[in-house]
Regions:
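Active-site loop segments of alpha/beta catalytic cores
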Residues: 5, 18, 28-306
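N-terminal accessory beta-strand-rich subdomains and adjacent acidic, glycine-rich linkers
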Residues: 1-29
């Protein structure tokens, strides 16, 4: 394992056998410290042109230190692969600066003071988005915004609070991406049903990962919202591990109904665990490649009402 102190004055531990790191301490532990918190210059060229710790892309089976410069990585993939920029929005920054428990407490204890901190975080994210697009020099195909604003049953906090303090800044980020011709995929695990219409209102081009374990179903969402928004994900990783091959084929072909007319990228609904045998992983990928061609031929799994 490894312990890392981040630029957000927090410490996380990465156990190599566990997919995600665990935050163990935060220096910003009072609302007064949050109000005094200073974000590092989002336009600092070192973010894009210098090697160093990448505390998002560096996380994998281990934790990579001193990763290549961001722009070098972009150039190594472009144009052979679609290359998306990425940015955390305020909710994800709260996880990294104060932790989700403090965030939820402060919404109740200090709603306006905490709300101003959220707004400052999104102002930082907006400027970092602009700087990233400029540094890429036209080499990006789109943008992913990391939010993670929900759990299995609902969003973490009142949708009205989110609309007041989080949504305006998020929309500004989306607008800047669109001004540069970059479609936006918004990432939030959990059940975000209560704000799906807000996603559409903000101009989110697609939602990821449509967590099946949070009672989201891509076919139902396509019924409800049509092609106002795209979808990425929804293959339940628990089913992927537990179901037999016939069951997997039924699941995959049924979900591919959401691809009618475009707008669906088939993906896992969360991080792929090591409980999925490589043979099953490969089987699902081959199914998508075979049956995900247009015109779709889904046989007995074709749904007439889509």
């Amino acid at each position: 394992e490894i312990t890392v102190r981040t630029g957000f004055e927090a410490v996380f531990r990465k156990i190599y056998s566990v997919p995600m790191p665990e935050y163990v301490s935060y220096d910003t532990d009072t609302i007064e410290k949050a109000e005094a918190f200073e974000f590092i210059d989002p336009r600092d060229d070192r973010r894009f042109y210098s090697a160093g710790d990448n505390q998002i892309a560096g996380v994998g089976d281990g934790f990579s230190r001193n990763t290549p410069a961001w722009l070098d990585t972009v150039k190594s993939y472009y144009p052979d692969f679609p290359v998306y920029g990425s940015i955390c929005e305020a909710n994800e920054y709260m996880t990294r600066i104060i932790g989700i428990e403090k965030a939820l407490h402060w919404i109740g204890q200090f709603p306006e003071r905490y709300g101003r901190f959220v707004e400052r975080a999104n102002e930082f994210a907006l400027e970092l988005t602009k700087a990233q697009i400029k540094a890429a020099g036209g080499l990006l195909d789109g943008f992913v915004v990391w939010g993670d604003m929900a759990y299995s049953n609902n969003v973490f906090y009142s949708p009205d609070y989110w609309r007041k303090y989080y949504k305006p800044g998020l929309k500004k980020i989306i607008d800047v991406c669109h001004e540069h011709g970059l479609p936006v995929i918004y990432h939030s695990c959990g059940n975000v049903n209560k704000v799906y219409e807000d996603f559409i209102d903000m101009g989110v081009d697609a939602h990821n990962p449509i967590e099946a374990k949070a009672d989201l179903d891509v076919v139902d969402l396509r019924h409800q919202y049509g092609h106002q928004i795209g979808f990425c994900g929804n293959m339940n990783v628990m089913d992927w591990a537990a179901c037999d091959y016939d069951e997997l084929k039924k699941i995959v072909l049924t979900k591919l109904n959401a691809a009618k007319g475009g707008g669906f990228i088939f993906q896992s609904d969360h991080s792929v665990p090591n409980s999925i045998p490589p043979e099953k992983y490969d089987y699902v990928v081959k199914l998508v490649k075979e049956y995900g061609q247009y015109p779709l031929k889904l046989g007995t799994h074709d749904l007439d009402n889509l």
